[in-house]
Design a protein with these regions (language model features):
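YjeF_N-associated NAD(P)HX repair module
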Residues: 170-180, 289-387
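Conserved beta-strand in the GNAT
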Residues: 49, 55-63, 68-75
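Nucleotide and nucleotide-moiety/phosphate-recognizing core
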Residues: 206-295, 304-325
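Conserved GNAT acetyl-CoA-binding A-motif
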Residues: 96-114
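Positively charged, low-complexity intrinsically disordered leader regions
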Residues: 171-213, 379-387
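Active-site rim helix/loop that mediates acceptor-substrate recognition in acyltransferases
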Residues: 24-52
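Conserved acetyl-CoA-binding loop-helix of GNAT-fold acetyltransferases
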Residues: 76, 82-95
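Short amphipathic alpha-helix that is part of the acyltransferase structural core
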Residues: 1-31, 155-163
Length: 387
């Protein structure tokens, strides 16, 4: 008998579900897995593990609205594909959500055309039909499908998807001290510090627009901000993207050291800034990369940027590389947005909550796009979020 169980942090086969998610969907189509768990079964989302009695089959992730329900992710355990389970699962799931919809890659010339045709045939066999409406998700063009006879207004689809993505972007604004206190409270009561650092790095990794064939340089300081960068470097390396690390100095926070060691074990190249690397040398080096990830200073930085970091930041700003700043632009005051010099980013990925300095007029001169990512940080004496 097919049955569905809610997925949360206590699900017994959570690691298997995570691995299937990584196997079934390319990284450009994935959101961070911790977010899947964080907002699963909340705010109009169902994240369900699927079983045939006690036999695990896979998972389904659905956005549930008043007008329609939309399958965002659906995957069957690798060894059970072609076994008829996909049809049985959809048959049972449509009893729960009669106005069920999904999206597939359109049938047009592509490297995976055969796979696209098989997917279309599968869903048609299971009572879905194309709706002549195309949408873009995670930068990928898709074609909507719905149960036979079903009409979908594009605005209902967009409303559903927007609600989901808005659900893990925190809108609250904190001071640097308030953010530090929230970090400490979360680590003391909910999430291990290494796990929280991993979540931060994973969030930055998914926001970045890097692809296979790109060259990425992670420029890292000595604090936890650098640790986020080491997580990103390892994830890039896993995906086959060329990545290197430039250390300002060989000094690490405890958690940063942990993730830097993983990078070393996995063969990621790194260099250490030295006196021979003047502005021109750095500029020439930076121009050879497609992306630079700025992890030099975190939100706790204040005062003036001194050499050799001053010349390094100037070279980043003058280079042709696209720049992503982790949590805050290095050199910027997290409360005021002021800086004598700071990294100019194409995108800044704020972690947890927006910081006051990031939304000032002064900061806007240095930030191309500002994105804030919820990683489950909880403020004491507030409405605690699922972590």
């Amino acid at each position: 008998m097919i049955r569905f169980e809610t997925i949360d942090e206590n699900t017994k086969n959570l690691e298997e579900i995570k691995q299937l998610y990584f196997d079934a969907f390319p990284f450009e189509e994935r959101i961070p897995f911790y977010i899947m768990v964080l907002v699963g079964n909340d705010r109009g989302v169902e994240f369900l593990s699927i079983y045939d009695d006690d036999k695990w089959l896979g998972f389904i992730h659905t956005l549930v609205g008043d007008e329609l329900s939309y399958i965002f992710y659906f995957a069957i355990e690798n060894s059970l594909r072609q076994s008829g389970y996909g049809s049985r699962i959809l048959h049972e799931y449509k009893k729960i959500h009669p106005r069920l919809s999904l999206a597939i890659e359109p049938i047009e010339e592509s490297d995976n055309l055969k796979q696209r045709k098989k997917r279309l045939e599968f869903y048609r066999k299971n009572g879905f039909e194309t709706l002549d409406t195309r949408v873009v998700e995670m930068g990928v063009e898709l074609e909507l499908m719905g149960a036979k006879g079903m009409e979908i207004r594009e605005r209902d689809y967009k409303k559903l998807v927007k609600k989901f993505f808005d659900s893990f972007e925190q809108k609250r604004v904190l001071s640097v001290k308030e953010m530090r206190d929230a970090d400490s409270y979360t680590i003391a009561n909910f999430v291990d510090s290494k796990e929280l650092m991993y979540r931060a790095g994973e969030a930055i990794f998914y926001v970045g627009d890097w692809n296979i064939g790109d060259k990425v340089l992670v420029v890292a300081g000595s604090g936890n901000n650098a640790g986020d960068g080491y997580v990103v470097a390892d994830l890039l390396n896993i995906e086959g993207i060329d990545v290197e690390i430039l250390l300002i100095k060989e000094k690490f926070s405890e958690d940063g050291q942990y993730y830097f060691n993983i990078c070393k074990q996995n063969g990621i190249k790194y260099n250490i800034l030295d006196d021979s690397m003047d502005y021109q040398t750095l500029l020439d080096k930076f121009n050879s990369y497609d992306y630079i990830l700025d992890c030099i200073y975190g939100t706790g930085f204040s005062g003036e940027v001194k050499e050799p970091v001053y010349s390094l930041i100037k070279a980043i700003n003058d280079s042709n590389a696209s720049v992503v700043s982790a949590d805050i632009n290095s050199g910027m005051n997290g409360d005021t947005g002021e800086a004598d010099i700071c990294v100019n980013s194409d995108i800044t990925v704020s972690i947890g909550f927006l910081k006051k300095g990031l939304i000032t007029d002064e900061a806007s001169k240095h930030i191309g796009e500002l994105v804030n990512m919820d990683i489950g940080i909880v403020i004491e004496n507030s409405d605690n979020r699922t972590v």
